[in-house]
Amino acid sequence: MSEIIQDLSLEDVIGDRFGRYSKYIIQERALPDVRDGLKPVQRRILFAMYSSGNTYDKNFRKSAKTVGDVIGQYHPHGDSSVYDAMVRLSQDWKLRHVLIEMHGNNGSIDNDPPAAMRYTEAKLSQLSEELLRDINKETVSFIPNYDDTTLEPMVLPARFPNLLINGSTGISSGYATDIPPHNLAEVIQGTLKYIDQPDITINQLMKYIKGPDFPTGGIIQGIEGIKKAYETGKGKVVVRSRVDEEPLRSGRKQLIVTEIPYEVNKSSLVKKIDELRADKKVDGIVEVRDETDRTGLRIAIELKKDANSESIKNYLYKNSDLQISYNFNMVAISEGRPKLMGLREIIESYLNHQIEVVTNRTRYDLEQAEKRMHIVEGLMKALSILDEVIALIRNSKNKKDAKDNLVAEYDFTEAQAEAIVMLQLYRLTNTDIEALKKEHEELEALIKELRNILDNHEALLAVIKDELNEIKKKFKVDRLSTIEAEISEIKIDKEVMVPSEEVILSLTQHGYIKRTSTRSFNASGVTEIGLKDGDRLLKHESVNTQDTVLVFTNKGRYLFIPVHKLADIRWKELGQHISQIVPIDEDEEVVNVYNEKDFKNEAFYIMATKNGMIKKSSASQFKTTRFNKPLINMKVKDKDELINVVRLESDQLITVLTHKGMSLTYSTNELSDTGLRAAGVKSINLKDEDYVVMTEDVNDSDSIIMVTQRGAMKRIDFNVLQEAKRAQRGITLLKELKKKPHRIVAGAVVKENHTKYIVFSQHHEEYGNIDDVHLSEQYTNGSFIIDTDDFGEVESMILE
């Protein structure tokens, strides 16, 4: 044999071969036919079982035999693919109406594998026989099988709209399909209405076909998504589990899940919910149990005594497959091509198929009836001249001679002559003669009826309607899925997501932040905090994990950080730098931190800058949902910076202290509530290159402590301060020296809880008791506590 060598480019070969492969996958494997709702392997399985008599009214038969028949005659692929498809057709959590009944382990909603095919037994379900009914009446086209040894149907007669009733899912080259199951009675009713009113709208159709009806039940939300899918073939709905509350002893309760979304793995769902509980992602769940048994699906979620069951349920809806989004993608093979189809198109294609099936069946029945009529007429004629016929047959040489003589002598046809010579003697009684007359009358009526169906389109549609109504009456079942018009908004209370726990928040001057358990803090003490060289603790306080931290920076920005998102770090260890949580500029520094519980309107923040600007903003303005970037809390001009932020519950006095020892005290009610992007107003009238070193709230039980660059500390009583108006010059708190004048580098208001001070110089930290610092007069410079010649100038101070 001579070889044929073609010189082709690799690009052309690959493109051509992949195109052929894709066409095969699309048409012959992954996508269902719109007419019978079946993929080729499913159709071959059902036809093989029907052909071998493995039907509903017979006994179960080993699945392996069916798989062997399918592989041997119709589907030359691996046995596992055939058996898997066969098993799916028997799973009542996958199909709304199973097409195969199976004895033995056919898998589970937990995605457990089925038993091997040598152990399971199967037969067609009663409904699946309606897919195959009349297939032997030339209703559908047959094609040769893969080795031309037998024929297989291109499509099944499908006496009900299986594509909509059982749905389909599949992925092929460039195409995917997701068609949900529907209620049989609703689909048939919708089809009947379409037959009566071909121009029916989607809105009108949805009065009958309300939406998907999943075998696993559940609650479907989003009428608009259903409508869009029915109009265009694509749409989206939310499917959520059916969850009820059940009381337990001692006032506790549990959530009981009895229905889950379609195609959700139950065991994976239980595992996920338990992981959320174990990882403390949700607070209030004691235990998760799978209590499913032969009576039905049941997942028990036991709750703590005072748990917010509604919020826990909503959290699970959002963070587990207790609720999913189902995306319609109604692609099916129509006229040999994949097509995205709406509801009307699917029903129209099915109806056209039924018109063809009923027409072909009627032609077949008419042909058979006419053939029988011809035979009956011949028998009746023969019986009317019985003696002559008998004599002719007796005088004939053989059967063929008798037939030829009958045709020649009495004008019988070949078929009639065959029937006459095959007639048994007992059929010559009067009873059988009358039976032939009756059969003749019945055949006349049948032929008339069949011809009317073929000639009258309305009569043909009436047949389709009658047969659909018959199936509806026989197989009608109640809807399992509930449809709700709107998609529910999921609201989750913070306490459900975050276990309530008191922790210690700490922030250093260099921007290291952490939360620490009270146990670790108490075991170490404040002074044992982990710090980098040169860093100092700016603030520490007790907060709750459900609180929110607001970290303010010198650039007039704040960071919004939920406490539970802070790393849980031991007190002796270094914290996490703020820039690792929210990115900030390299030269940006933290100035203060506060925790918020509820961002209530009554509270407000006072923000003050180095160059004497101040503003007031209500706490509610700081609430946000953005955690990933700094947010503006004050517009700060160039060469200025934010030096402090004070949180107050109500209006009270604040005092401003400057570098040159000026002090101004006034009420915050002089400040209007402004937006976060405002620049503020003048706080104090600064002169001679002076700047603000402190702005804090103050009341009559407080004192003010300050330290100068020369190492002197001074403490004054509240009474020294003089309440004035905003933007004034203020009073002088230092005695001005001509040589080496004192300049304030740090100041603080001493509250009742303050007992100690720490003063930081360039090379030294000075600790002392606040009570040991005596109260001074207005025009003094205080007492020296640090020798700056030995330890360098003072830089800062904190109170504890």
Curated annotation (Swiss-Prot):
Topology with regard to the membrane? Peripheral membrane protein
| Matches recorded under Gene3D superfamilies | 3.30.1360.40, DNA gyrase/topoisomerase IV, subunit A, C-terminal, Topoisomerase II, domain 5, Topoisomerase, domain 3
- Site described as Transition state stabilizer, located at R118
Domain annotation Topo IIA-type catalytic: ranges: 31-496
Keywords from UniProt, A to Z, are: Cell membrane, DNA-binding, Isomerase, Membrane, Topoisomerase
Q: What is its main location?
A: membrane
Enzyme Commission number: 5.6.2.2
Q: Where is this site: Interaction with DNA?
A: K39, H75, H77, R88, K94
Function, as annotated: Topoisomerase IV is essential for chromosome segregation. It relaxes supercoiled DNA. Performs the decatenation events required during the replication of a circular DNA molecule.
Which protein is depicted? DNA topoisomerase 4 subunit A
Q: Which organism is it from?
A: Staphylococcus epidermidis (strain ATCC 12228 / FDA PCI 1200)
Q: Which gene encodes it?
A: parC
